[in-house]
Amino acid sequence: MVKEQFRETDVAKKISHICFGMKSPEEMRQQAHIQVVSKNLYSQDNQHAPLLYGVLDHRMGTSEKDRPCETCGKNLADCLGHYGYIDLELPCFHVGYFRAVIGILQMICKTCCHIMLSQEEKKQFLDYLKRPGLTYLQKRGLKKKISDKCRKKNICHHCGAFNGTVKKCGLLKIIHEKYKTNKKVVDPIVSNFLQSFETAIEHNKEVEPLLGRAQENLNPLVVLNLFKRIPAEDVPLLLMNPEAGKPSDLILTRLLVPPLCIRPSVVSDLKSGTNEDDLTMKLTEIIFLNDVIKKHRISGAKTQMIMEDWDFLQLQCALYINSELSGIPLNMAPKKWTRGFVQRLKGKQGRFRGNLSGKRVDFSGRTVISPDPNLRIDEVAVPVHVAKILTFPEKVNKANINFLRKLVQNGPEVHPGANFIQQRHTQMKRFLKYGNREKMAQELKYGDIVERHLIDGDVVLFNRQPSLHKLSIMAHLARVKPHRTFRFNECVCTPYNADFDGDEMNLHLPQTEEAKAEALVLMGTKANLVTPRNGEPLIAAIQDFLTGAYLLTLKDTFFDRAKACQIIASILVGKDEKIKVRLPPPTILKPVTLWTGKQIFSVILRPSDDNPVRANLRTKGKQYCGKGEDLCANDSYVTIQNSELMSGSMDKGTLGSGSKNNIFYILLRDWGQNEAADAMSRLARLAPVYLSNRGFSIGIGDVTPGQGLLKAKYELLNAGYKKCDEYIEALNTGKLQQQPGCTAEETLEALILKELSVIRDHAGSACLRELDKSNSPLTMALCGSKGSFINISQMIACVGQQAISGSRVPDGFENRSLPHFEKHSKLPAAKGFVANSFYSGLTPTEFFFHTMAGREGLVDTAVKTAETGYMQRRLVKSLEDLCSQYDLTVRSSTGDIIQFIYGGDGLDPAAMEGKDEPLEFKRVLDNIKAVFPCPSEPALSKNELILTTESIMKKSEFLCCQDSFLQEIKKFIKGVSEKIKKTRDKYGINDNGTTEPRVLYQLDRITPTQVEKFLETCRDKYMRAQMEPGSAVGALCAQSIGEPGTQMTLKTFHFAGVASMNITLGVPRIKEIINASKAISTPIITAQLDKDDDADYARLVKGRIEKTLLGEISEYIEEVFLPDDCFILVKLSLERIRLLRLEVNAETVRYSICTSKLRVKPGDVAVHGEAVVCVTPRENSKSSMYYVLQFLKEDLPKVVVQGIPEVSRAVIHIDEQSGKEKYKLLVEGDNLRAVMATHGVKGTRTTSNNTYEVEKTLGIEAARTTIINEIQYTMVNHGMSIDRRHVMLLSDLMTYKGEVLGITRFGLAKMKESVLMLASFEKTADHLFDAAYFGQKDSVCGVSECIIMGIPMNIGTGLFKLLHKADRDPNPPKRPLIFDTNEFHIPLVT
């Protein structure tokens, strides 16, 4: 034994890389401790001890608690296990490398074992292989190239032998077709072989037909001998790494027996038998077969028997590795399913995904959740029961020793207490349930560790599955409370997507101080008020809070002093118990002092004068009447000036999540996260208190329609039904005008559907007119807390048309939907129109149709969840290791640049205040004006404003902003200055300040200080919006695209609106885009025209593009038989050609027929006049004249006479913008190139929605833009807004290699290098075996790999390499040492 190099034990060793490879039989023997030879597991005597040299020999480790390992003497927990080996009597193919073996056999000569390349080619490839930076991808590509070259040759350059094709044949069998040849000139080797059988054929005629199928069977022994003879200089050309394994290692001659701890035997006491692992049983079978073959060989059995046993041995070895083999013959198939090695690794429950990438953790709890508005938004109530079990290891120090003593005395049963003590020097843990706790408490020393219960103020992680985005797990502060549920403030429901109908949530207590700090700063609720998807607030008021705040701020809500004080007092809870509150002066003094609800709401924003918060907001509410701003008739224009609500009632837009005009959002952006969180907590207490005191309930009375409403409803229904009858009548008489691109039937459906949905909408608006404003459902719909006007009108007036995949109910019976109606009935009721309301109840047929629509919704949701879940997993896997670096680029873990600057401007999507813009200048300016009134300063004129701005922006602190941002500011200031000039010109105010009255200068007033503050604020906000280096931009992008996907509809409703162009939308469309599918379901090319205001011109171009068949423009095509001749006569319809504006005549038709695939010669087609074409058939060897005539008659109508064959149809789309009609073409089909080249189409303004098509035609940059536009278009269509930076990152990742790679297992394998990452995604075993074959090195650097290896990943905190070196004191204090006297000093001789 070589002495191991000395290492300090506590130094962490980091894995730098992993090499994959194959073990040679010799290495296996060296690694193993024993050779396993016995097929029995236990000795047959009464001891039942594991047999020596058996599969369960205890020298390979131990699987029982009470028996130590016999090799190293350690117990079950410490012994890693030791290997054994089995020698196979005959070699077998390794099922994992079977494809690789065939690959090598195709590349080498089967006679002399050299690779089938000439010397020059060898040299060329070897030079290429010597390149140092050869990536895994290039290696795989090169192998394919060499393989293709070798397979084309069949004469070996080295020995001149003939080689046929090598194929897999049946299960684990390979054949070499040595004597089969397709060439006209037969190779001499083959002819010799055939001649040798001549005499045999003479005597036995049956041999002859079989001779052509002669082939060589390559069994493992033959292959092994071939592989051993491959020359060493040819091995690199097989792309194998000689250090990681030789070709002969691909064939099993020895099997490693894994240690016992991997395959434990379970002892069950019933019949004192044992339960063995699948691997153990397979190994015994293999040993048994080995013995059988050995006996056969010694006794000299028939070759056939040995061959059969060999096949069976081979199958057992294959099942040992991968038990899910396909194609096993029935007589050999295993009776029961077992788990092989591959099964242990693959799949969600396998080693990679189940135990390495994700694992269960300690110190976590899970229980049901319930709401509690008295908690602050960053708190969570933890049951005492949980708090006693979750502990935190706290070190004893000067500050906390008395506190911890008290906890130790309380012990594990009383909360707050402690469960264990670990003393500083001993590694022993002492359990506090037993023993003298008083004594232990007194003996506490500094540096001991006390495992104390969870107490108030601990940082815990709180999570709800499914965790679709990073806000699904956040850090809260714990509050220990009685009862048995987790409770939290309802404002935090949205990010978790939680409701309280029995949801459960998980809680984890981080175990170190660093983890606590990191959790609080990075994952704290307050730090995540906005979503990184687009910077909108997610944590905001919901449901009751909205209703309460809405009712509180209505313009007729007044309170006397007692009531006002009582409501305001509800905010004095918990931390806020001691805050000062200043009651504002009453609004109404006589006859009694009254306060308005708006004043009370202002107290939430700013309770007292000590509070610095002065928020400003002007925005439209939900029911804004459209004119007069703050004089809106519905009081729905919200104005907040310096934290006082001046006008408007609060609703979802100003308090709820998902809008940037939210008051909490303003507080967050201008005053910081703590102020926003405090205001939200105050609202969460005050609104429910007010609401429950005022009373707010909903009952059947709220949805009872009045007489007037019923009458209005019947009138509406009658009018609508009458109109539908008219349409049906028009269809029957043939007077219905068709919509472009639709048949008459489709047009009718579209018209009726439109008409019936109008009925419901009108009934709904009639409802709203009738209902009293105190009606509860109406109030909820108005303030946006729950429900919509459609829900109300369905309850009160009419449920409306039931749509199934976007159209009316289809026919389930013969020509009718249900047997209650007449056949071919097109009436509204027969096709799923529900005229009743939920209040009046549905008739049986209506109910049936209603359940049909409901069923569709349910199925849709269930399917959608699985689809989007898988899509999100793929997105995360491919984007996870992208990270913004210190040089502002975005790179993957291997250092490939994906973007030169994140999103084109390096800004963080979460910090955007406008739509995709970092700032909304107008709001910032209004805010500055309100907070800094500067009463004594003069107002600036237009020119002064521009000059002041430019002088401030020349200062050095503005150098850090990008030029484009500074341009934006200048543009905005210019707009403001123009407005000032307009106002001053209108009122005749001069710029030198002498106009009377002086008050005119207050109009659009802006002062120098305000300009300066404005520019400073802009600069600060811009710098704050920069993306931090180290941010995991990829993961954020994946979540921001995947998470809205779950809220989209899955099925695509083909709406018959847009000139009936059906575009796929929703999840299937997103899936198509990110899969980079070559053939998408609805390819559409949008073509702008050279003249876009002329309808006739549009029709002309449409004719040039749309595929027109001969059958569509001919009056008749008929066969003509003359006595001596027969031909087909085609009569063109000149009228139809003229109407369709086609550029077709008899001559062009003749040309089209000749160039089509009908095999008609130009001499056979004659043109008579302008409208008649005759085609004469020709007899050929295969068929007679009559049949040729019939074929022609069949195929002539399908000849394309004009247009692009791939285009099925084109529709003229009319854009009515600014009063003018603009025409463009929507072309269905793929052939962008041909459409762009069509005369009359503006080629530069033609786009397609098929990424592949665009890449083929216009290149990779155009494809990237297409991906961006298509994803954005799909999202916007579903009302989702995603910051464009996310979409840009995704499209850059898909296109940065120079081709469009889909986010699928194929695209991922082309993007990523790392074996571990690919193995943890899909096809685990294939990737691992491939890596071993190539001898691949994995330099653990990506996210997946780091998690699997358990080392910190280089993203975020792991990104930087330099640490700050603290300043040291140059002369540190010296301690006097014992021997520090001069006589002990040795003089230094220099």
From Swiss-Prot:
The upper taxonomy is: Eukaryota, Metazoa, Chordata, Craniata, Vertebrata
- Bridging helix: region residues: 843-884
Q: In which tissues is it expressed?
A: Expressed in the brain, in the cortex and the white matter (at protein level).
Species: Homo sapiens
Question: Where on this chain does Zn(2+) 2 bind?
Answer: C109, C112, C156, C159
Q: What's this protein's name? A: DNA-directed RNA polymerase III subunit RPC1
What quaternary arrangement does the UniProt entry report?
Component of the RNA polymerase III (Pol III) (Pol III) complex consisting of 17 subunits: a ten-subunit catalytic core composed of POLR3A/RPC1, POLR3B/RPC2, POLR1C/RPAC1, POLR1D/RPAC2, POLR3K/RPC10, POLR2E/RPABC1, POLR2F/RPABC2, POLR2H/RPABC3, POLR2K/RPABC4 and POLR2L/RPABC5; a mobile stalk composed of two subunits POLR3H/RPC8 and CRCP/RPC9, protruding from the core and functioning primarily in transcription initiation; and additional subunits homologous to general transcription factors of the RNA polymerase II machinery, POLR3C/RPC3-POLR3F/RPC6-POLR3G/RPC7 heterotrimer required for transcription initiation and POLR3D/RPC4-POLR3E/RPC5 heterodimer involved in both transcription initiation and termination.
Q: At which positions is DNA nontemplate strand bound?
A: K144, K167, R1159
Which compartments does it reside in?
Answer: Nucleus; Cytoplasm, Cytosol
**Coding gene?**
POLR3A
